[in-house]
């Protein structure tokens, strides 16, 4: 019994001893009695914390004592109200400690210094090749008026005002605030002309390179022409002027414009429309989860429709399905009147006004009543269309007929009129290209053709032209009038050949009959990746210029302009 009591007492002693040894020092805990402020010395950059700026720290504590400052970068101070400079940009925690009172910590974000480029002057409202000059401006926050060296790198075809070619220009900043400038510049090539500037800061004798800057100068053509837009896979919306190169001055290149607006994740379609005499591009991005998903909770949707003005200066959200059902993402569509008609993955298509902005997707694939048209609402259902048939495109002709290609649980092109929706007792008419899979699709009613990108079927794989037959007639996939074998890449995102991307959209030039499309080459394909077109007059597939971008959605603005 005595042994047990002794053991119990020993344990209590050990516990008590442990408690005493681990007791924290409460005297310097965060305290409401400790506080401080900080600001940039001087007035010019008083609201911006740059890494070359001198910061004034002021102790505003209500209680006094010995102070210690920790600036979060390995340096400290015991001054009452110190100043400090940070050598690098980043986030720092600054702590003021007053012995016996407590401490206070505030985060501070120190910014990098980035030169800002702008077009300060231009000799005409629209910058065009050869004859319109610009002058660039540069602004650099420089609190200590340190000497800066600038290296300007010009795009190919840049000249001075007198026509002298210029590739690089090196200049310096000066004590009077001026910066050496290359002067007036002209451009020989159409497209986004990217001017890059490297900036070097002299800090304590160190030749430190700051973040590089660039500006895209949009340079138009010397003649008016339509504009071809396309969605780069993993990039921005880009554009080309649709100009016959024989009409360009000698040595001029027709290069793409970077519109500065994101294409999204998987932009299978982009659609041109004019609203109140303003031209817009609608971007249908079905997101990352565009193939079959197990989405029992209906939350994996990540697609959206955005709209961009033709010049890229305006962009806005039309409708979002982020957080909705994955199968309700927007895949493809067309404009009819003042509405955009757009497909989901495999239930049907809906409508939205071309002027709507900031909407949230409400359609549910389990509720067909939330669609303008669904698979189940047509007489084709169980007569060629099975449950969950996946859509690939949507078109509408001048006779009021919808053309609705399918690629899974249905094959071919299904045609119907608005009055056929809801009538399920019989098929509206015959199925076109039955047994085939048509991915990209377009109508050319002026020349009485339609076009398909075939991914399966008896005709083979590639680009095909067919005659536009009467509504009551049918057509087999082998009855094409033109066919070109081309192997497009399935592209990442799905293991199903039915839902692979291949070529997702065609754009028909009404003036020439040429059919444009983005092509991502499969392994072993002789045609390289880029923009292609079917030359209607020549009856040949041609590479558009020297394009090499991976493009999905594509459309044409027929309005003839020098720029946009």
Regions found by a protein language model. Name each.
Residues 526-564:
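Blade-level signature of beta-propeller repeat domains, shared across WD40, Kelch, NHL, RCC1
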Residues 214-261, 270-273, 281:
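An edge-strand/N-cap motif at the start of beta-rich repeat modules
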Residues 19-224:
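Extracellular/lumenal mature domains of secreted and surface-exposed proteins
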Residues 235-243, 289-306, 347-353, 409-416, ...:
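Structural motif
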Residues 255-266, 318-326, 367-387, 430-436, ...:
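Surface loop/turn motifs at the tips and blade-to-blade linkers of beta-strand repeat domains
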């Amino acid at each position: 019994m005595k042994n047990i009591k002794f053991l119990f007492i020993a344990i209590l002693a050990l516990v008590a001893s442990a408690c005493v040894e681990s007791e924290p020092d409460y005297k310097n805990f965060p305290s409401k009695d400790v506080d401080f402020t900080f600001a940039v010395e001087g007035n010019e950059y008083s609201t911006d914390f740059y890494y070359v700026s001198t910061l004034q720290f002021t102790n505003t504590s209500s209680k006094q004592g010995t102070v210690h400052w920790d600036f979060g970068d390995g340096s400290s101070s015991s001054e009452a109200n110190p100043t400090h400079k940070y050598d690098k940009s980043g986030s720092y925690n600054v702590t003021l400690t007053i012995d016996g009172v407590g401490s206070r910590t505030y985060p501070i974000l120190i910014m990098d210094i980035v030169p800002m480029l702008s077009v300060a002057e231009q000799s005409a409202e629209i910058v065009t090749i050869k004859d319109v000059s610009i002058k660039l401006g540069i602004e650099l926050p420089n609190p200590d008026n340190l000497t800066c060296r600038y290296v300007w790198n010009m795009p190919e075809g840049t000249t001075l005002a007198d026509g002298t070619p210029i590739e690089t220009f090196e200049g310096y900043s000066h004590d009077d605030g001026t910066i050496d400038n290359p002067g007036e510049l002209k451009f020989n090539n159409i497209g986004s002309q990217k001017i890059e500037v490297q900036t070097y800061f002299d800090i304590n004798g160190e030749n430190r390179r700051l973040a590089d800057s660039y500006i895209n100068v949009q340079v138009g053509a010397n003649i008016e022409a339509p504009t071809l837009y396309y969605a780069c896979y993993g990039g921005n919306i880009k554009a080309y002027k649709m100009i016959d190169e024989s009409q360009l001055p000698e040595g001029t290149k027709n290069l793409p414009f970077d519109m500065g607006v994101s294409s999204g994740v998987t932009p299978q379609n982009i659609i041109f429309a004019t609203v109140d005499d303003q031209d817009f591009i609608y971007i249908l991005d079905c997101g990352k989860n565009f193939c079959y998903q197990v989405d029992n909770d209906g939350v994996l949707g990540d697609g959206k429709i955005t709209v961009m003005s033709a010049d890229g200066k305006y962009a806005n959200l039309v409708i979002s399905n982020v957080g909705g059902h994955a199968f309700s993402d927007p895949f493809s569509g067309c404009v009819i009147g003042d509405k955009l008609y757009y497909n989901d993955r495999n239930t049907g298509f809906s409508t939205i006004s071309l002027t709507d902005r900031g909407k949230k997707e409400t359609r549910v694939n389990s509720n067909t009543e939330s669609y303008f048209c669904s698979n189940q609402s047509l007489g084709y259902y169980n007569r060629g269309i099975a449950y969950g048939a996946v859509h690939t495109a949507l078109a509408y002709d001048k006779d009021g007929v919808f053309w609705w290609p399918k690629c899974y649980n249905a094959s071919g092109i299904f045609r119907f009129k608005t009055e056929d929706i809801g009538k399920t007792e019989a098929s509206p008419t015959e199925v076109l290209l039955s047994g085939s899979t048509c991915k990209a699709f377009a109508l050319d009613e002026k020349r009485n053709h339609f076009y398909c990108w075939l991914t399966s079927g008896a005709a083979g794989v590639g680009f095909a032209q067919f005659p536009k037959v009467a509504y009551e007639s049918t057509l087999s996939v082998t009855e094409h009038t033109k066919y070109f074998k081309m192997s497009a890449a399935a592209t990442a995102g799905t293991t199903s050949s039915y839902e692979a991307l291949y070529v997702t959209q065609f754009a028909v030039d009404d003036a020439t009959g040429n059919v444009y499309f983005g092509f991502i080459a499969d392994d072993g394909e002789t045609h390289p990746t880029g923009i292609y077109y079917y030359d209607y007059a020549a009856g040949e597939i041609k590479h558009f210029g020297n394009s090499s971008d991976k493009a999905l959605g594509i459309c044409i603005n027929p309005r003839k302009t020098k720029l946009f």
